[in-house]
Swiss-Prot record:
Lineage: Eukaryota, Metazoa, Chordata, Craniata, Vertebrata
Name the UniProt record assigns to this protein: Homeobox protein SIX3
Record text on subunit structure and interactions: Interacts with EYA4; translocates EYA4 from the cytoplasm to the nucleus and promotes activation of their target genes. Interacts with MTA1 and HDAC2; represses its own transcription. Interacts with MTA1; facilitates the binding of SIX3 to the core DNA motif of SIX3 promoter. Interacts with EYA1; promotes EYA1 translocation to the nucleus. Interacts with TLE1 and TLE5 (via Q domain); can act in combination with either TLE1 and/or TLE5 leading to transcriptional repression or activation, respectively.
DNA-binding region: 206-265
Associated disease: Holoprosencephaly 2: A structural anomaly of the brain, in which the developing forebrain fails to correctly separate into right and left hemispheres. Holoprosencephaly is genetically heterogeneous and associated with several distinct facies and phenotypic variability. Schizencephaly: Extremely rare human congenital disorder characterized by a full-thickness cleft within the cerebral hemispheres. These clefts are lined with gray matter and most commonly involve the parasylvian regions. Large portions of the cerebral hemispheres may be absent and replaced by cerebro-spinal fluid.
Coiled-coil intervals: none
Length: 332
């Protein structure tokens, strides 16, 4: 029976990538092709001696096999044995990084599957962040979220890998929540998922993200808002360059500001209605003495006039908006 290794799926140029210099390439070629060639020669020698007896052929074959094994380089004692080639953990990590950068997830998965499962080899592999990150990437793209969570929760990653791993952590939980609810998640749903499944400290440095803009940025946004509460995309891009924000952040700030101003206008309208003629009469009914209970027509009509004028100005987009009444310290 002929045993075919999983690494037979890969071509020789893939198994000898650019990270190996000429010296290491010769070593790897000697340990693979050179060794097999030497063994084949010994076997042929044993076969030619078959006329002298079966024992001679067997001895020749054994000698050939021994000759092939003696070609292993002595400096590779720290390497672990793969089915056909000797790779150090650093070289395996380099292969994983290359495949991850190129986006060849299918080939990356096959390569990881072909790695040895011996306890000593696994321990050496798990010390390399690139290999662990590659396992997490494959688990995410194959939908094996349980393995993804296990890798991310039980291994400490450096800050350079946090962004990508955090995105996979959140997206995996989003997909599970969508599958459970049977519908796409909205912003509020995603917020609840993030609260329910916070980032593990292995991929998060504990620093809270702040959405508070600097005073200069908020001042500039307010000035533009007073000029035009509904900026077009070109103005958003221009304002984004001036403030250092993204066009999306600028659009969100204007949207939130308009919502706050509408809420403030509605609150003011209710207050004006409460102090109108009916409100004054309701205060006078219990017998409380009031001065000037007879209201002049101009005074009685003033709240209505102010509300209507405010409505007209809001419709035309030229209302004089308050800068401090509905402004907040933190804007998203």
């Amino acid at each position: 029976m002929v045993f075919r290794s999983p690494l037979d799926l890969y071509s020789s140029h893939f198994l000898l990538p650019n990270f190996a210099d000429s010296h290491h390439r010769s070593i790897l070629l000697a340990s693979s092709g050179g060794g097999n060639g030497a063994g084949g020669g010994g076997g042929a020698g044993g076969g030619s001696g078959g006329g002298n007896g079966a024992g001679g052929g067997g001895a020749g074959g054994a000698g050939g096999g021994g000759g092939g094994g003696s070609r292993a380089p002595p400096e590779e004692l720290s390497m672990f044995q793969l089915p056909t080639l000797n790779f150090s953990p650093e070289q395996v990590a380099s292969v994983c990084e290359t495949l991850e950068e190129t986006g060849d997830i299918e080939r990356l998965g096959r390569f990881l599957w072909s790695l040895p499962v011996a306890p000593g080899a696994c321990e050496a592999i798990n010390k390399h962040e690139s290999i662990l990150r590659a396992r997490a990437v494959v688990a995410f793209h194959t939908g094996n979220f349980r393995d993804l969570y296990h890798i991310l929760e039980n291994h400490k990653f450096t800050k350079e890998s946090h962004g990508k791993l955090q995105a996979m952590w959140l997206e995996a939980h989003y997909q599970e929540a969508e599958k459970l609810r049977g519908r796409p998640l909205g912003p509020v749903d995603k917020y609840r998922v993030r609260k329910k499944f916070p980032l593990p400290r292995t991929i998060w440095d504990g620093e809270q993200k702040t959405h508070c803009f600097k005073e200069r940025t908020r001042s500039l946004l307010r000035e533009w808002y007073l000029q035009d509460p509904y900026p077009n995309p070109s103005k958003k891009r221009e304002l984004a360059q001036a403030t250092g924000l993204t066009p999306t952040q600028v659009g969100n700030w204007f949207k939130n500001r308009r919502q706050r101003d509408r809420a403030a206008a509605a609150k003011n309208r209710l207050q004006h209605q409460a102090i109108g003629p009916s409100g004054m009469r309701s205060l006078a009914e219990p017998g409380c003495p009031t001065h000037g209970s007879a209201e002049s027509p101009s005074t009685a009509a003033s709240p209505t006039t102010s509300v209507s004028s405010l409505t007209e100005r809001a419709d035309t987009g030229t209302s004089i908006l308050s800068v401090t009444s509905s402004d907040s310290e933190c804007d998203v």
